[in-house]
Amino acid sequence: MTRGNEKEEAPPQAKILGSFPTGIAPYAELMRVHRLLGFYLNTSPYLVGVAFCASISPTKIPITVLLHRTILLSIWSIFLRSAGCVWDDLIDMDLDSQISRTRTRPLPRGAVSPKNAFLLTVTLFACGGSVLIYLPWPCAVDCLIITFFALLYPFGKRFTDYPQITLVNIGWAIPMAMHSLGLDPLSQMKPTVCMFLFIGLVIIMIDVIYSRQDTEEDLKVGVKSMAVRFRESIELLSYSLLYASTGFLAMAGFFTGLGLSFFVVSVGGHFCGFWVLLKATRVGNSYGVESYAKSAFFLATLFWLFGFVIEYCLRN
């Protein structure tokens, strides 16, 4: 997903990477510890999922329980994201070596061996999965589903123009958050599906915008993606994803009977925040994309959370 598209133009120079010992820095770079956008994209769906559950639960969920689940799910998402980055680079090593923005990554430049990268992937997934012992058993099934699609993602760009579709699985954070709090997604099927699709479409939208930076080189190498497939109509695609995601978020609020504050703060904040992102990046320019995306996604997450938190407070 966005994990696979967090490109680097030079060997690790970021201050955060410089704080690691020389032998560890390439592994930290491989895990993208210095690229915050990926952490935002993978962690915020779980935060939103917990807030969503709190606002629709028929009984009040204690704040201590909400904080406990938030911490555990955040830990899981951080390890998931890091493992996904390593796995993507391992599978894409031959392609990354042919693209200027990625050929300086640890694997193409030989700073990390494929064997060590594989072992790191397994270790990270295992560490993330360890939090499941503190969560209800249905979360283990959710974990397996999310992990399966995370492993599948890097293969998609070799065989289909729509590898970003697998990123919809990040929206599975919603049912996982519900299971962690003892709520049954099937009893709230319509809003759960809407929230799932909302998260998935937002992730796809950002990934498409980010992937656009390398469209020309991807065409030469043979990398497939929606950014390549719709390179002549990338603006139409991006705005369509924005409108669709806004619609699904609004429908989730409608099906659960959320109030005006949710629609003004969460839905309105989401639309305005990403509309500004699309305008600022002009939907195809590479300059400043990551910086704009980080700011827009961070602010949008705050709007999503504030709307749900207000509803939680009003209902309780």
Swiss-Prot record:
Q: What is this enzyme's EC?
A: 2.5.1.-
Q: Which GO terms describe its cellular component?
A: mitochondrial inner membrane
Q: Which reaction does it catalyse?
A: 3,5-dimethylorsellinate + (2E,6E)-farnesyl diphosphate = (3R)-3-farnesyl-6-hydroxy-2,3,5-trimethyl-4-oxocyclohexa-1,5-diene-1-carboxylate + diphosphate + H(+)
Which cofactor is essential here?
Mg(2+)
List the CDD domains hit by this protein, alphabetically: PT_UbiA_COQ2
TM stretches of this protein: 36-56, 60-80, 131-151, 163-183, 191-211, 247-267, 294-314
Q: What class of enzyme is it?
A: transferase
Q: How does it sit in the membrane?
A: Multi-pass membrane protein
A single GO BP annotation from the record? ubiquinone biosynthetic process
- Family membership noted in the UniProt record: Belongs to the UbiA prenyltransferase family.
Q: List the protein's name.
A: Prenytransferase adrG
**Which species is the source of this protein?**
Penicillium roqueforti
Give me the gene this protein comes from.
adrG
